[in-house]
Regions:
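"…together with the soluble PPM/PP2C metallo-phosphatase catalytic core" -> "…together
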Residues: 1-213
Length: 215
């Protein structure tokens, strides 16, 4: 039930190996990448934090020998704590709190934006958990989802002159591409073993880890 550990490990090592390749060889792009973008590293850490909640849940299931891990109340509390840490991190960015309902029309929602972020992350994580009832469903949809993000982030990197207001750091979009491609590759590799009949179950570790799509 803890097959998601392989997805998390595959993502970490894929991301690390890609950066080692850039640091040592650097071929393929006319850029020199000698660091990991802090924003992308934070996403990786946040994914690990949320996955740790799923790990506790899965570990209790294995330890008790039955399909009962954390109860709903404790699980939600832990998810809210992690989501609050993530929300506070975004708060330190001094981002705009204006919510645009229509083009040219926005409403300043103030501090409510950070509560919305917490609600969105917790809600998205549990929504993904609901889709984990069929073999290969979460792994398959996650592969497609992260694959789509990969196309967008890499496109922005290759056309960075058109997105200077959106991506001030040219390496940010490329580093995001590396991260999401690592996750997509891990999900795709896991899908081989998770299709019906599943030999390995994803578990709450991977379900919680794939909440990165919410960011």
């Amino acid at each position: 039930t803890m097959g998601g550990v392989f997805i998390a490990a595959g993502t970490f090592f894929g991301f690390l190996i890609a950066h080692i390749n850039f640091w040592t060889i650097g071929q393929g792009f006319k850029v020199e990448i000698d660091y990991i973008v802090p924003e992308v590293l934070s996403l990786l850490l946040f994914g690990t934090l949320m996955a740790s909640v799923g790990f506790i849940d899965d570990f209790l299931k294995v330890q008790q020998g039955r399909n009962l891990g954390l109860n709903a109340k404790n699980k939600i509390i832990l998810q809210i704590i992690v989501a609050s840490i993530i929300s506070y991190y975004f708060y330190t960015w001094d981002l705009s709190t204006t919510l645009y309902l229509f083009s040219g029309f926005g409403v300043d929602i103030g501090i409510a934006k950070w509560f919305i972020i917490v609600l969105f992350i917790v809600g998205f994580t549990n929504a993904v958990n609901l889709t984990d009832g069929l073999d290969g469903l979460v792994a398959g949809t996650s592969t497609v989802s992260f694959g789509g993000v990969l196309v967008m982030t890499f496109w922005i990197f290759r056309h960075q002159n058109y997105y200077t207001n959106f991506m001030n750091d040219a390496f940010l979009s490329l580093d995001l591409s590396i991260l999401v491609s690592s996750i997509a590759g891990s999900c795709l590799g896991f899908l081989w073993w998770n299709t019906n009949p599943a030999k390995i179950i994803m578990g709450d570790v991977a379900v919680s880890y794939t909440h990165l799509r919410a960011h």
